[in-house]
């Protein structure tokens, strides 16, 4: 077990429950799994819109699959690196990170994220991973003021981008649009980091680090002209979670697209098979030469076998890499794919992006969600003490009276909505068909 500070919680707990012998991370996993924020993932878009088909993944089923892959990666690393067993704490830790990793993503996927980022452009921005950190540490009502009150190591593990918005944001942003219908996502990419509103909590998470480790951990890549800066480092646990997420995205979202007929065997062979036939790795060359036949087979068991083969291939190609510049073991070691498998995974991710995410039908759904979120924000911002639900009004007034960022309260409220709830609320506010008989929605 690593140093005890990583097991600490911001709020000291003295819960004496009968015969409760769970580890700190088993408790964290339970809190995430039983949270309202986690349950809402069942009705949030992964890639394909909720309701398009009964087969596809939602963010909840995606998170469950990421958790399974993450524990598989952990098991592989323990076998490959037995000398580093003390690094690998409870399996529940990795499960916790994987289950929680998407918990802050707003309705309508990337469209909702860009919409909230634009509406928050003068108020600290918005980004799904930053919102995840915010939900876990403050918004989810497991405690009064400390969110789920998770262990410090768990919070370190969800920090995919350990940096503050203000230190990463490129100041010379695009000109504001004259009409929100004209907003282009490419012009308003979210800053990937922690909101400045949550700086004190970030400081608490990093408190056990020595100064040199903290300074290095917060370093950024040099930004291209006109681009936001990107963070450089993440913890060991976070690196496992991120790899599991990437594998699930590339492989399972591919499966959804195949089943729904969005991609074709011809596209696969021309874009993937032709690219990977020159791989330096023999397993990649041999498997990808024929695996497309199974993926696009009319026999479902063959497709499932191919999906399992791909996941296994990537999981077993992961090892530990060491950065000697760090003293803290949780930062010194990261999980990483072999270079050839990393390239192969990138080919799959780009295939999904090119033929699925960029497909006009998918982009139309994303655009529709983008407009829904921006119009909801405009409405609530125009008269928050009239339109926000009672409890959210109280939070808004409290922030306003304390001179805090009250716009963040509106972003918190909208980002917590499911796709269906946001669409229904939008209808209640803007659809003339509903007249004056508006069904009062239960607050999230």
Curated annotation (Swiss-Prot):
One of its GO terms (biological process) is dGTP catabolic process. Pfam families: HD, HD_assoc. Keywords: Hydrolase. Residues 59-250 form the HD domain. CDD domains: HDc. Residues 1-26 are annotated as: Disordered. SMART domains: HDc. GO terms for molecular function: dGTPase activity. Belongs to the dGTPase family. Type 2 subfamily. PANTHER family: DEOXYGUANOSINETRIPHOSPHATE TRIPHOSPHOHYDROLASE-LIKE PROTEIN 2, DEOXYNUCLEOSIDE TRIPHOSPHATE TRIPHOSPHOHYDROLASE. This is Deoxyguanosinetriphosphate triphosphohydrolase-like protein. It comes from Shewanella woodyi (strain ATCC 51908 / MS32).
């Amino acid at each position: 077990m690593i140093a005890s500070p990583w097991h600490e919680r911001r709020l000291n707990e003295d819960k004496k429950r009968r015969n409760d012998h769970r580890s700190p991370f088993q408790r964290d996993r339970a809190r995430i799994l039983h949270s309202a924020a986690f349950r809402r993932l069942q009705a949030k878009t992964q890639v394909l819109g909720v309701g398009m088909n009964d087969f596809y993944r939602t963010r909840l089923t995606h998170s469950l699959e990421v958790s399974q892959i993450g524990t598989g990666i952990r098991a592989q690393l323990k076998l490959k690196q037995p000398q580093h067993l003390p690094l690998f704490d409870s399996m529940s830790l990795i499960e916790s990170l994987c289950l929680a990793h998407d918990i802050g993503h707003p309705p309508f996927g990337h469209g909702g994220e860009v919409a909230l980022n634009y509406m928050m452009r003068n108020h600290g921005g918005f980004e799904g991973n930053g919102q995840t950190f915010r939900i876990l540490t403050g918004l989810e009502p497991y405690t009064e003021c400390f969110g789920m009150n998770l262990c410090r190591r768990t919070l370190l593990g969800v920090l995919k981008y350990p940096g503050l918005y203000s230190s990463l944001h490129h100041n010379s942003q695009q000109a504001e649009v004259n009409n929100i219908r004209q907003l282009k996502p490419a012009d308003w990419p979210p800053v990937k980091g922690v909101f400045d509103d949550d700086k004190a909590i970030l400081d608490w998470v990093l408190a056990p680090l020595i100064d040199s480790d903290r300074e290095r951990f917060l370093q950024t890549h040099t930004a291209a002209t006109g681009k936001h800066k990107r963070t450089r480092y993440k913890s060991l646990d976070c690196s496992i979670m991120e790899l599991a997420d990437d594998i699930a995205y590339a492989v399972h979202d591919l499966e959804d697209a195949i089943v729904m007929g969005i991609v074709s065997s011809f596209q696969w062979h021309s874009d993937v098979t032709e690219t990977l036939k020159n791989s330096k790795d023999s397993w990649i060359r041999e498997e990808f030469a024929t695996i497309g036949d199974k993926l696009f087979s009319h026999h479902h068991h063959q497709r499932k076998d191919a999906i399992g083969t791909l996941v296994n291939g990537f999981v077993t190609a992961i090892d530990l890499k060491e950065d000697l510049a760090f003293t803290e073991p949780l930062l010194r070691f990261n999980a990483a794919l072999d270079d050839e498998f990393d390239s192969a995974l990138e080919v799959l991710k780009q295939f999904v992006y090119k033929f699925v995410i960029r497909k006009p039908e998918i982009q139309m759904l994303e655009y529709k969600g983008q407009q829904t979120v921006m119009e909801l924000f405009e409405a609530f911002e125009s008269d928050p003490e009239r339109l926000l639900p009672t409890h959210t009004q109280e939070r808004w007034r409290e922030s306003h009276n304390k001179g805090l960022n009250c716009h963040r309260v509106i972003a918190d409220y909208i980002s917590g909505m499911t796709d269906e709830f946001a669409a229904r609320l939008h209808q209640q506010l803007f659809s003339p068909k509903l007249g004056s008989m508006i069904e009062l929605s239960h607050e999230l």
